[in-house]
Amino acid sequence: AITGPNLIDFVDDELMPYLEKFKGRAESPDTIEYKIGEIFGEIRNKFQSGYSLRDALEHVDSLQFRSQEEKHELSALYEEKIKRMGNAGRNGGEYYTPRPLIRAMVQVTNPTIGERVYDGACGSAGFLCEAYDHLRSTDLTADQLATLQGRTLYGKEKKSLAYVIGIMNLILHGIEAPNLIHANTLA
């Protein structure tokens, strides 16, 4: 396994550009390939040490998320990190709406399969994730699940970091190719 400066060079010069090209090769914006390309077009490698990056990669590689419950636990940790960023005065808080408020909004709107749920300033996509969990709480047919996955949840986000956070949050919740658009809703 490569490490040190060679690993940083590989990530910066080969891996990130390769993943960014997924967007151009994707069949449509509705695919996970397109979303991967968008994500890697928005982010940059923050690691300066290839040794630290190798340690992080080995730690992540040891994690196993086989069940839906384990994946949900990862998404909860992810949202907690976003929340803490905001509480520490960093910009993560502007993308995070407290979960109890989101749950109340979903309970009041009570979305059903076949309806569309839209968040025009989705930030971390917490509202869309909660709506997804609400809709998944019932037994769904294969057709209903396909509708939920591809034709129910929509969002827009203007800021690049929030857009990437929202995409990742939806993927961690189980939405294979989130219908988020990186755009200004009011423009």
Task: Give each language-model segment a name.
Residues G92-A187:
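Conserved S-adenosyl-L-methionine
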Residues A1-I113, N179-A187:
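Non-catalytic, mostly N-terminal accessory regions of nucleic-acid modification and defense proteins
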